[in-house]
Each structure stands twice: as C-alpha cells, then as structure tokens.
Swiss-Prot record:
The keyword Membrane applies. The record marks R465, F466 as: Cleavage. Residues 1-47 are annotated as: Disordered. Specific enzymatic cleavages in vivo yield the mature SU and TM proteins. Residues 1-89 form the signal peptide. Retroviral envelope proteins mediate receptor recognition and membrane fusion during early infection. Endogenous envelope proteins may have kept, lost or modified their original function during evolution. This endogenous envelope protein has lost its original fusogenic properties. SU mediates receptor recognition. One of its GO terms (cellular component) is plasma membrane. Residues 10-20 have a biased composition (Basic residues). This is Endogenous retrovirus group K member 19 Env polyprotein. Residues 466-486 are annotated as: Fusion peptide. Belongs to the beta type-B retroviral envelope protein family. HERV class-II K(HML-2) env subfamily. The surface (SU) and transmembrane (TM) proteins form a heterodimer. SU and TM are attached by noncovalent interactions or by a labile interchain disulfide bond.
Length: 699
C-alpha cells in the first residue's frame, strides 16, 4: 500500500471547538424546574372590576383586624395578595383539567316554537268586530306592529297532525260560506225577505261521512242543541246577526287523507229545490255551488245573485252557527271553533239583502230569488303570545313528521289583505325542553358546599404543612373558609357551555315577556284576563317543574339537575328530535326521563343542605390534629416504648442544655458587675482592677 492510499484511508481529524463560551452561557441558563404549560381549562382572566377590588380590600381589612396587625399600605397589599393566593392555589385533582361533567338541564321557555296540533285545546282568537263575527273582541291588535311580518325559516317536528289552513296537503282548504235569515212578508208576490252574510270559511270535501254509516257517525256527534227546522227569523235590528251554536243533522268531511280525518257538525246552508208534492221530475240538488273557483272574485265581483225555477226555493241546513272542526282519526281531539275566525277575517264579509218572489209563467208558478249586495265589512283576527302564525309556503311531510317553511313570516293578525296563495300554520312557544349541559365541576346544590369542598381538598392534601402555616400566620380554618368563599364567588368564571344556554334562554325569556305584556288600557277587559290566565298556566307548569327539581346553585334562569347524562342511553339524535318537537319511537322519552330526574332530585332533598359539608369540615379538622398522626405511627407496644424513651432522652437533653445556659448566664452577669466596679476607680488602680477582673473571670 503506497503512502497516497494510506493517506486516503486515514480517519478524518475531529474539529476543535475553539469558542465554548456560548455553550457555557447556555448551560448556566438551564433550569430543572417544570415548564408552566397552558392547560385546556386555562381561561383568559378579565380585568378585576371595582366591586371585586372593593370586596378584596374589605377582606384584607378584616383579616388584619383578626390578626391584630397594624393597617398600613404594605400590610394591606400583603393581606390582599395572600387572599388571592389562597383562592387560586387550591389544588386541582389529577385529570380535572380534562374532566367533563354532563347533566340534564330543564330550560323553561326557550327560543323554540312548536306546531299547534288538533289534540291541543282551542286557542283564543280575537276579532275587531263582534257584531258580525262572534267571539272575544280586541281592536288594539297587534300589540307590536313593527314586529309583524318578521322573516323566519322553520324546520320542526310533530306527533299529532298540525293545524294548517290553506291550499296544500295537510291543510284545511278555504271556501265561501253563506248564512241566511228570513223575514216573512205579507206581499202577494213576495214570500220572504232575506238577509244573508257571505264570508270565507272551511271547504267541505263531501257532504256526509265517507266510509262511515249514519249510525256509526253519530258516535262523533257533539253534545249540543240541534239546529232549528225553520230559518231563523230576523231580529228587530237588521244590522245585527244573531249567532247561535247548533248541531246539524249530518256532518261534513273537511279532510280525509293520510294526515287524518277531520269533520264538522255545523250547518252548511244552501238553496235547494223543494220537491215535496211535485209530480214532475224535480232536481233536488243544491243550486248555489259550495266552492267557487276564485274565492276573492266571488266575493268582490258578483254583487247580484238571481235564482229562478218552477219549483220553490228552500234553504237547507238551517241555523246560524260557526264551523267547529275536530279530528276523529287517527286520534280523536277537541273542537276548534277558533279556526273559522281566522279564515273569515282573511277577506271582508259581504252583506246581502233580497227576497223570493212568486210569478206565473206558462200558467205555472215561477219562483225567483233576487239578492243584492252593496255593503262589505272588513275584519281582523288576532292571536296573542305565546301563540303566533307562520305564513308562507308550508310543507308538511307525514313520513318524517316534519314541517318546513323557508322565508316565512311571523304574524299575530290576519286581515282582508291576506293572500290565500300562502298557508297559515299555528305555532306556539315551547313550554320547556330537556337538554344535556356540560360543566367542568361536579353538580353542587349550594355555593357554600362547593367552596368548603374545594378548600377541604387543599387542606387534606397538604395537612401536615398547612397546620404549621396556620400557626405561623395565626389564622384559623374558619377565617380561611370564609375568605375563600367570598373571594371565590367574586373571581368565579362560569363554564362556556352553561353561559351559552343561559344567554340563549335569557334572550328568549325577554322576548316572550315583552310580547306577553298586557296593555294597561285593556287590563280591565275580560278577554285580556282570559289570555293572561292561559299564559300564567304555562308559567305555573314551569314553576311546578322547577320546584320539584333540585338544581345546581350556579344557574338561575334554567335548572341543571343532578341526573347525569348517559350518551349510550340517550344519544344526541334523540335530543335533536326532542328539540325539533318530534315525538315518535326514536324520540327522547320525556316521561321516563322526568321520572329518573325527579327520583334523583328526591335523593338529594333527603339530605339537609350543608350537613354533608359540615361533616366533611369536622373530619378535616380532626385530621389536622397532630395526636392522630402519632397514633397512626405508634400502633404497637414496642414502638410506643421506643417513642417514650426518645421523648425522655429529648427531655433530659433539654434539661442539660438549660442548666448549661443558666451557668453561662451567671458567669456573664458576674463579669459585667466586676467591670462596672472597676470602671468607677481612678487610673492608679487600673492595673489592679485589670488583674482583679482577670482573677474574677478565671474563677
């Protein structure tokens, strides 16, 4: 191998670090303490408020008074820092940063709505004119005109068929209906004088119950006065229409499809041919159609009606009664007479007057009904909170039991400007919902128990050190607990999820309360009192729920119950369906959940508030006793003897040290006395005094 090859295979030389100063400098800066990491539960603190600083100053002053320390600016600052340090230095258990406590919460009157169904009780609908339309009256609606017509998108569920009006599947169709009264006349050519009212009503599909016999249909017949067999006679005041509820001989079907079967037992008056006693063929069918192609045109354009026939005209299904629809399938619900007051106000009503005359044509009697109209009456119907009207392109899906509507409007009143190209859905505010709420601490029934528990954790975790700290600062456990309680409440930061629910529910509470305020000018009216009673009934139901529940101390507008949320038992899809208002087999079983929550609340009610916390404090104070520490160590006789010998040895050692210190003190005292005597002599005796001092000290 030649030298050149040996040189190529030689290992490379190591580079020398000429300047090691930077490394040394970095080594000097290295520390072994743990780096302060930002935990997930760490929150950005807000600047202290004036009230917090004032309270902190009061606590510091009280602490200095208890410890009998002079109040100076320095001592006040140190006391305040100690109080803050005491509050923020409470130990956090392992894994508490990632802990997540989820409980069931009851939120009353959330910002949610649900559809009014055929199984709900009738609602109050107010009209502005009780002369032509029966029912409660209120001519001061709407209460907030500036809020009428607000846009909204809805997607809600339902259990029973919802109440909907309009030309759409699942909604009751509108139609024109007539109500007629007659006044007998003595004229030889005029049989009767008629007064008739035409207005928007509910459209019948068939005249009689479909798929039901007469006998079977009678079981759905409501209790009430049967309609008269004669046409009601006009009262003396021709400007007043007397309404009298009655039950017709047969019912009409308003709806019979997959959404349910809805019937009405109110009379549906129309003109018929009276064929009794006629020998020739007599068409007994009704003449005036029950349904017009254009509803508004039939009420606006046609101001004259003339019916002619060789057979006498008779008004069928007599009676002046309003429609009262009710559902009979798949469930049976109550009557809803209030729906007609909404439809009749969607267009003005028309007032007719006329008569039936008798003539002779071709030697046969000829009957003519002549009706004319020149008077219309505009109407307005309104509902009051918690009820509202959703107007727009409403779509009801029976398969999924959902109702959707995009770009709809929220209204409380309907008048003659309404367009029947839209649909009307009755909705109301939700009385309350059950939702899971997460917190970063366990459920507590009162703030005192929460604070005592946290302080006691810190005391017991550092009991042996904390006892000497208490002795050093001359501060008792009661003072520490009181200080931590007040300062902890002042510096407390709520959980974000609870804050979200709180703000969510607080805004809706303000909204419903503002809408439900009763006008002082109408406070004496009986209708407002009735609506207030309905509203107060919902409030009482909510209060009844809250009185039965044991709630967490840190919430006021809604109730966090002690029932832990079990995701495996109630998955979030069930909660979502509950929020949407759907009640099917997959929806949250509210009745079962209420039973579980009430049982959990009763279990917490059996405990006297504060008893458990006070018992914990007593146990904590017992653990602070040093004698208990010795007892735990000295559990055998041999160890006890050893401890006694150690104590005697320590006592003997203390006695010997005390005697030695006493001798040294006596020697120093004698020396000082000798020095004092010598200092009084003159200079000639100084040497002697020094020798005497030396002799005295050496003795």
């Amino acid at each position: 191998m030649n030298p050149s090859e040996m040189q190529r295979k030689a290992p490379p030389r190591r580079r020398r670090h000429r300047n090691r100063a930077p490394l040394t400098h970095k080594m000097n800066k290295m520390v072994t303490s743990e780096e302060q990491m930002k935990l997930p539960s760490t929150k950005k603190a807000e600047p202290p408020t004036w009230a917090q600083l004032k309270k902190l100053t009061q606590l510091a002053t009280k602490y200095l008074e208890n410890t009998k320390v002079t109040q100076t600016p320095e001592s006040m600052l140190l006391a305040a820092l100690m109080i803050v340090s005491m509050v923020v230095s409470l130990p956090m258990p392992a894994g508490a940063a990632a802990a997540n406590y989820t409980y069931w919460a009851y939120v009353p009157f959330p910002p949610l709505i649900r559809a009014v169904t055929w199984m709900d009780n009738p609602i109050e609908v107010y009209v502005n004119d009780s002369v032509w339309v029966p029912g409660p009256t209120d001519d001061h609606c709407p209460a907030k005109p500036e809020e009428e017509g607000m846009m909204i998108n809805i997607s809600i569920g339902y259990r029973y068929p919802p109440i909907c009006l309009g030309r759409a599947p699942g909604c009751l169709m509108p139609a024109v209906q007539n109500w007629l009264v007659e006044v007998p006349t003595v004229s030889p050519i005029s049989r009767f004088t008629y007064h008739m009212v035409s207005g928007m009503s509910l459209r019948p599909r068939v005249n009689y119950l479909q798929d039901f016999s007469y006998q079977r249909s009678f079981k759905f017949r409501p209790k009430g006065k049967p309609c008269p067999k004669e046409i009601p006679k006009e009262s003396k005041n021709t400007e007043v229409l007397v309404w009298e509820e009655c039950v017709a001989n047969s019912a009409v079907i308003l709806q019979n499809n997959e959404f349910g079967t809805i019937i009405d037992w109110a009379p549906r008056g129309q003109f018929y041919h009276n064929c009794s006693g006629q020998t020739q063929s007599c068409p007994s069918a009704q003449v005036s159609p029950a349904v017009d192609s254009d509803l508004t045109e039939s009420l606006d354009k046609h101001k004259h009606k003339k019916l002619q026939s060789f057979y006498p005209w008779e008004w069928g299904e007599k009676g002046i009664s309003t429609p009262r629809p009710k559902i009979i399938s798949p469930v049976s619900g109550p009557e809803h007479p209030e729906l007609w007051r909404l439809t009749v106000a969607s267009h003005h009503i028309r007032i007719w007057s006329g008569n039936q005359t008798l003539e002779t044509r071709d030697r046969k009697p000829f009957y003519t009904v002549d009706l004319n109209s020149s008077v219309t009456v505009p109407l307005q119907s309104c509902i009051k909170p918690p009820y509202m009207l959703v107007v727009g392109n409403i779509v009801i899906k029976p398969d999924s039991q959902t109702i959707t509507c995009e770009n709809c409007r929220l209204l409380t009143c309907i008048d003659s400007t309404f367009n029947w190209q839209h649909r009307i859905l009755l909705v109301r505010a939700r009385e309350g919902v059950w939702i899971p709420v997460s917190m970063d601490r366990p459920w507590e029934t009162s703030p005192s128990i929460h604070t005592l528990t946290e302080v006691l954790k810190g005391v017991l975790n550092r009991s042996k050190r904390f006892i000497f700290t208490l002795i050093a600062v001359i501060m008792g456990l009661i003072a520490v607990t009181a200080t931590a309680a007040v300062a902890g409440v002042a510096l407390h930061s709520s959980v974000q999820s609870v804050n979200f629910v709180n703000d969510w529910q607080k805004n809706s509470t303000r909204l419903w309360n503002s809408q439900s305020s009763i006008d002082q000018k109408l406070a004496n009216q009986i209708n407002d009192l009735r609506q207030t009673v309905i509203w107060m009934g919902d409030r009482l139901m909510s209060l009844e729920h809250r009185f039965q529940l044991q709630c967490d101390w840190n919430t006021s507008d809604f109730s966090i119950t002690p029932q832990i949320y079990n995701e495996s038992e109630h998955h979030w899809d069930m909660v979502r369906r509950h929020l949407q208002g759907r009640e099917d087999n997959l929806t949250l079983d509210i009745s079962k959940l209420k039973e579980q929550i009430f049982e959990a609340s009763k279990a917490h009610l059996n405990l006297v508030p504060g008893t458990e916390a006070i018992a914990g404090v007593a146990d904590g104070l017992a653990n602070l006793n040093p004698v208990t520490w010795v007892k735990t160590i000295g559990s055998t006789t041999i160890i006890n003897l050893i401890l006694i010998l150690v104590c005697l040895f320590c006592l003997l050692l203390v006695c010997r040290c005390t005697q030695q210190l006493r001798r040294d003190s006596d020697h120093r005292e004698r020396a000082m006395m000798t020095m004092a005597v010598l200092s009084k002599r003159k200079g000639g005796n100084v040497g002697k005094s020094k020798r005497d001092q030396i002799v005295t000290v050496s003795v």
